[in-house]
Amino acid sequence: MSRTLSIKERRTVKKILFFIGLTIILTINYMYNFMDSQNNAFNDFQADSETLVTGIIFADCRELDNMQYGLGRYYTKSGPLMSRYGTNYTYLTDENWTLGYSNYTAQLIFDKNYYTQTYAVEGNFIKFATGEIFPIISSMEDDEYLVVSLASDEPLNVSQYGSLSETAFLDQEGRKLPDSAVEIYKSQYGLQGKVFRFMANSLGMEIQEGDKTVYHLICSLLTGLTFVMLVWLIRIKYGNLLASCFYITFLLSPWVVNFAKNLYWVEFTWFIPMLVGLFCSIYIDNKKWRAISYIAAYTSILIKSLCGYEYISTIMLGMTSFLVTDIIYMLISHTDKRKIGIAFRTFFLTSLFALAGFITAFIIHAYYRGEGIWQGIQYIILEDAIRRTRGIDNTVDVSLWYVLGRYFQFQTEIITGIPGNLFVIICTIPICIFIYEYVTGKINWKDVILYGVFFLTSISWFCLAKNHAYVHTHMNYVLWYFGYIQICIYVIVKRFAKFCKGKA
């Protein structure tokens, strides 16, 4: 016999349904971008980066190698595996070439890539669809193509020998070489690639004809779930208004939406550390939850670092941002020294465990990167870390102010409906509000501290890797959404609501 739910139980059910509803809305938007028809970058955003994951899945399913790394680019003679599979590669045709065959000499022209540079080399052979085999006597490269010269006195042609897509390369002993190759991406461990590769092999989720829907759904769902949990905790700590500002920004930001489903970036790993830090700040008086938070801090940074080091300074500062805000406010408001001591100790241990997670990931990566951990560390620092922080071109050295200035000039909407040219105004209005409130004796120090802490959190990567940030403006605007834009909107909306109520 059924019973009627109590008031408390009904409230719990409503909260659960509300939580699920918020997650579903974010997930669907991250999958299909139904909230912003002007976001033209959505469909192919960072598709080249995503091929590092799909490439390793293709390579593994074709048993090219038992790869220790989780990321790599998959190549055939036609070029790299790109975001849209199944498109037919067209070999060069112009006044000198016809479908890849030279009109005048015994030469062929291929896309220059890792596969052709590895196998279309002097000493190997090329076998055509007709079964005829020619030795390769030389290969020459330019910026885009690789030209192969064959041991033949007469030019070859497509009508006689068939399409170049049906050719095969043979080694010096006449053994057939693989039809594809994978170039391992060694700049990071690539945990995300290992996870998706496991799903493809063990769970029967191989990518079919480029359909990544299931994988995108997983990333979108995990990102949406992470954001809703973050919003839920913000509501507990700060109230409905700030929570709403975070949710709306996560829903409507073109940058957050574009990154959300990407298999390489796995955006949810960026914000789980912030979720951990916020949870710790809420339950800071509970020793049990503090201990769990330390372990979660270590684990979340470990996972993020194994998936890549991009934005790591902002992510780690984001983890401690709420704790730092609390500590500064405690010092200003002369809170009990015991509570300040607990907050400082919690901040220190959280940071220590986070740093330990980063170091663990770094050592794991170094083990695979070189012949031994020490050599691997040298490779990572000299070949990867310096390149990422200084930029691709080390000869370029721009000022920090110039880099920051570029990131105050939005090329997209801030959120749907708010044009990017208003960003400077949106950043400035809270400062004007704080000055006015300070003069009138109504200053809200919590809001001031939130504004300052999240501003520093967002710009930390611009400062640490300014040359890299200078080059990668096509993606780094997302760093403003690590709380800073949300706080700006919150301060403005909060004061506007007070003004409308006559309480300004």
Model region roles, listed by residue range:
Residues 175-213:
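Short hydrophobic/aromatic helix or loop-helix immediately within or flanking a transmembrane segment
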Residues 208-216, 246-271, 301-302, 306, ...:
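Aromatic- and kink-enriched transmembrane "portal" helix at the membrane-lumen/periplasm boundary
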Residues 214-243, 433-439:
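Transmembrane-helix motifs of polytopic, lipid-linked glycan transferases
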Residues 225-231, 412-447, 492:
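Hydrophobic, aromatic-rich transmembrane alpha-helices
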Residues 245, 442-467:
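Transmembrane alpha-helix segments characteristic
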Residues 266-272, 471-498:
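Hydrophobic/aromatic-rich transmembrane helices and adjacent perimembrane loops
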Residues 293-311, 315:
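Membrane-interface alpha helices of multi-pass inner-membrane proteins
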Residues 346-426:
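Membrane-lumen/periplasm interface segments of specific transmembrane helices
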